[in-house]
């Protein structure tokens, strides 16, 4: 089965635990978090977009299309995912958050191998400790189900995935890690 895939970096949140600062634009080392994400994604996939609900001019400077959620009021990652699924011309979208700069360099390959089965519409990352559903490969075939799920008031990402046959794909620490940065202190403590 040949499928087309694009990638979307989710940078549309409120970042409450970061004092409202736009996470993707915060500096880690000498680069913004979004630059770290782009640098890890580009060897894996060429067609990248950024989902951001503020500071769109800043995000556009990285040279990729930027779009905001169609649903108002920062309704969480599923809102950005729905907008992406509605806009894409690809069969699947690889989603990553903007605050997890050390994710595996084989993320796409491993998730793609899980969706080779025509019935698998979502594959998401996990490691030895827990699931990481924001790192996922999702089929556009799910956009109607996702629209209805959000309209019902639900926002739980992992629940949506499990209800729709999502498959977890295990990654080892050697492949990369899913440590994310939620506070400015987290960023200051990390040396790269």
From Swiss-Prot:
Keyword Cell membrane part of the UniProt annotation: no
Listed GO biological process terms: bis(molybdopterin guanine dinucleotide)molybdenum biosynthetic process
Residues that coordinate or bind GTP: 10-12, 23, 51, 69, 99
InterPro entries the record matches: MobA-like_NTP_Trfase, Molybde_CF_guanTrfase, Nucleotide-diphossugar_trans
EC id: 2.7.7.77
Superkingdom field: Bacteria
Alphabetical keyword list: Cytoplasm, GTP-binding, Magnesium, Metal-binding, Molybdenum cofactor biosynthesis, Nucleotide-binding, Transferase
Cofactor(s) it depends on: Mg(2+)
GO cellular component, one term: cytoplasm
Catalytic activity: Mo-molybdopterin + GTP + H(+) = Mo-molybdopterin guanine dinucleotide + diphosphate
Pfam families: NTP_transf_3
Gene3D superfamilies: Spore Coat Polysaccharide Biosynthesis Protein SpsA, Chain A
The keyword Transcription is annotated on this UniProt entry: no
GO molecular function: GTP binding; metal ion binding; molybdenum cofactor guanylyltransferase activity; nucleotidyltransferase activity
Major enzyme class: transferase
Subcellular location field: Cytoplasm
Residues given in the record as Mg(2+) binding sites: 99
Purpose: Transfers a GMP moiety from GTP to Mo-molybdopterin (Mo-MPT) cofactor (Moco or molybdenum cofactor) to form Mo-molybdopterin guanine dinucleotide (Mo-MGD) cofactor.
Quaternary structure note: Monomer.
Family: Belongs to the MobA family.
Domain remark from Swiss-Prot or TrEMBL: The N-terminal domain determines nucleotide recognition and specific binding, while the C-terminal domain determines the specific binding to the target protein.
UniProt-recorded name of the protein: Molybdenum cofactor guanylyltransferase
Organism of origin: Haemophilus influenzae (strain ATCC 51907 / DSM 11121 / KW20 / Rd)
């Amino acid at each position: 089965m040949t499928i087309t895939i694009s990638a979307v970096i989710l940078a549309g949140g409120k970042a409450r635990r970061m004092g409202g600062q736009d996470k993707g634009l915060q500096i880690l080392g000498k680069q913004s978090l979004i630059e770290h994400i782009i640098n890890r994604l580009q060897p894996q996939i060429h067609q990248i977009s950024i989902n951001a609900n503020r500071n769109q001019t800043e995000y556009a400077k990285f040279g990729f299309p930027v779009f905001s959620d169609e649903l108002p009021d920062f309704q969480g990652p599923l809102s950005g995912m729905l907008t992406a699924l509605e806009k894409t011309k690809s069969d699947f979208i690889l989603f990553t958050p903007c605050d997890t700069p050390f994710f595996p360099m084989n993320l796409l390959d491993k998730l793609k191998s899980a969706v080779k089965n025509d019935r698998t519409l979502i594959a998401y990352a996990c490691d030895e400790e827990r699931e990481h559903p924001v790192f996922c490969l999702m089929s556009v075939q799910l956009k109607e189900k996702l629209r209805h799920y959000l309209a019902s008031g639900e926002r739980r990402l992992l629940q949506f995935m499990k209800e729709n046959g999502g498959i977890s794909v295990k990654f080892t620490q050697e492949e990369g890690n899913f440590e994310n940065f939620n506070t400015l202190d987290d960023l200051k403590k990390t040396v790269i």
